[in-house]
């Protein structure tokens, strides 16, 4: 029974070839990346490559103590497993887990590049880890402009990688049919897989550079969201209730609110008072009695006569005073103190 189970388990070559084939199908698929068909291939390929990686670890097929020449030509292709894992991880579509997918894909690419660097597959510089990149960014944050020399060197490196990648793809396409059909000798097979390793070194370096840029953008977006959320939470707090200082309360009790706050009479009292004097709107102008008219006329006549008499007397006194001043000049009669 155990022997039958072992026969049913997929072997390492089958896991590797199926995973590689699924990756090729995903890369050339015409359907949207988020479609169900494409995502099923992505998940299935990741599962197969994960099993292949576990099997490689159990078999201890590669060791850092050995050189590249000591690895069998047919086993060189299994060094590509981490690179395939990183490429398929990048194909996952889930916006809420995008940052996790990017970090996991970066780990796979770094694992692949580390193996190739240890075996001296090609001459290249390993990318910095995320912690070193963060420290480097913090140290260089005070620089207003990047170094022109560094920018030029990065551009030149990208151009060189692109040319090398195109050349490798051309050579691989020429050797593919012979190797896969089994007609190539061991030397050609070894050269074919070494070219594959070099090609995926260039791809991994480009992917890591793109991943670092996207991770930076996502983290800045998350930090801005947190800042906006904290600001909105402050704005959504209930308004502060108005408060009155004790001093103002005591002052209002003594001096009042600035206007008569207590009534001096009721509405009924006001109505009776105005009704008594006939000043209500519906009462019209109050009518005076005939006796009152007669008294008012008599008082007016007496006042006019009095004013006329007062005027005559005043005029007479003024004329007498003028005559006296004409006959008595200033200083008249003051003769006692004269020498």
Curated annotation (Swiss-Prot):
Keyword check for Cell membrane: no
What coarse category fits the chief subcellular location reported for this protein?
A: cytoplasm
> InterPro entries from the entry?
TAP42/TAP46-like_sf (IPR038511), TAP46-like (IPR007304)
Give the span(s) annotated as Interaction with PPP2CA: 98-202
| Tissues in which the protein is found | Ubiquitously expressed with highest levels in heart, skeletal muscle and pancreas.
- One family from Pfam that matches here is TAP42
Q: Summarize the PTM comment.
A: Phosphorylated. Monoubiquitination by MID1 triggers calpain-mediated cleavage and switches IGBP1 activity from protective to destructive.
What Gene Ontology terms describe where this protein resides (cellular component)?
Answer: cytoplasm; cytosol
Bias category Basic and acidic residues: which stretches? Answer: 313-329
Q: Which residues carry this modification: N-acetylalanine?
A: 2
* PTM-bearing positions, type N6-acetyllysine: 241
Marked site: Cleavage: 255-256
Q: Does the keyword Cytoplasm apply?
A: yes
Q: Where in the cell is it found?
A: Cytoplasm
> Where is there biased composition of kind Acidic residues?
301-312
Q: List keywords of the entry alphabetically.
A: Acetylation, B-cell activation, Chaperone, Cytoplasm, Intellectual disability, Phosphoprotein, Ubl conjugation
Biological processes per GO annotation:
B cell activation; intracellular signal transduction; negative regulation of stress-activated MAPK cascade; negative regulation of transcription by RNA polymerase II; regulation of dephosphorylation; regulation of microtubule-based movement; response to interleukin-1; response to tumor necrosis factor
Instruction: Give the consequence of mutating residue 214 to R.
Output: Abolishes interaction with PPP2CA
Spans annotated as Disordered: 221-243, 289-339
Positions of the UIM domain: 46-60
Q: What is the effect of changing residue 162 to D?
A: Abolishes interaction with PPP2CA
UniProt note: domains: The UIM domain is required for protective effect on PP2A.
According to the entry, the disease involved is: Intellectual developmental disorder, X-linked, syndromic 28: An intellectual disability syndrome characterized by agenesis of the corpus callosum, coloboma of the iris and optic nerve, severe retrognathia, and intellectual deficit. Intellectual disability is defined by significantly below average general intellectual functioning associated with impairments in adaptive behavior and manifested during the developmental period.
**Which family is annotated?**
Belongs to the IGBP1/TAP42 family.
SUBUNIT field: Interacts with partially folded PPP2CA, but not with the fully active protein. Interacts with PPP2CB, and with PP4 and PP6. Interacts with MID1 and MID2. Interacts with ubiquitin.
Name recorded for this polypeptide: Immunoglobulin-binding protein 1
Q: What is the lineage of its organism?
A: Eukaryota, Metazoa, Chordata, Craniata, Vertebrata
Per the record, the gene is: IGBP1
């Amino acid at each position: 029974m155990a022997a039958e189970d072992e026969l049913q388990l997929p072997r390492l070559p089958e896991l590797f070839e199926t995973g590689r084939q699924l990756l090729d199908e995903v890369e050339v698929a015409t359907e949207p990346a988020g479609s169900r068909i494409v995502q099923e291939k992505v998940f299935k390929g990741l599962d197969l490559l994960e099993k292949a990686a576990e099997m490689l670890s159990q078999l201890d097929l590669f060791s850092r103590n050995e050189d590249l020449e000591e690895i069998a030509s047919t086993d060189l292709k299994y060094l590509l497993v981490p690179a395939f894992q990183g490429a398929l991880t990048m194909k996952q579509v889930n916006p809420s887990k995008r940052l996790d997918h990017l970090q996991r894909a970066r780990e796979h690419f770094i694992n692949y590049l580390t193996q190739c660097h240890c075996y001296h597959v090609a001459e290249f510089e390993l990318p910095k880890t995320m912690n070193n990149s963060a420290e480097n960014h913090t140290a260089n944050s005070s620089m207003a402009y990047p170094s022109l020399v560094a920018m030029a060197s990065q551009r030149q490196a990208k151009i060189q990688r692109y040319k090398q990648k195109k050349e490798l793809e051309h050579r691989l396409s020429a050797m593919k049919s012979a190797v896969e059909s089994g007609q190539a000798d061991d030397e050609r097979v070894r050269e074919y897989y070494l070219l594959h390793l070099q090609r995926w070194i260039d791809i991994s370096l480009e992917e890591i550079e793109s991943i670092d840029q996207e991770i930076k953008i996502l983290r800045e977006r998350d930090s801005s969201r947190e800042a906006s959320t904290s600001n909105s939470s402050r704005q959504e707090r209930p308004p502060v209730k108005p408060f009155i200082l004790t001093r103002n309360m005591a002052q209002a009790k003594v001096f009042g609110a600035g206007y008569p706050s207590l009534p001096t009479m009721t509405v009924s009292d006001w109505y009776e008072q105005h009704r008594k004097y006939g000043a209500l709107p519906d009462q019209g102008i109050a009518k005076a009695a005939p006796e009152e008219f007669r008294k008012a006329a008599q008082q007016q006549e007496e006042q006019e006569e009095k004013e006329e008499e007062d005027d005559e007397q005043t005029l007479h006194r003024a004329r007498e005073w003028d005559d006296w001043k004409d006959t008595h000049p200033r200083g008249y009669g003051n003769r006692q103190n004269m020498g």
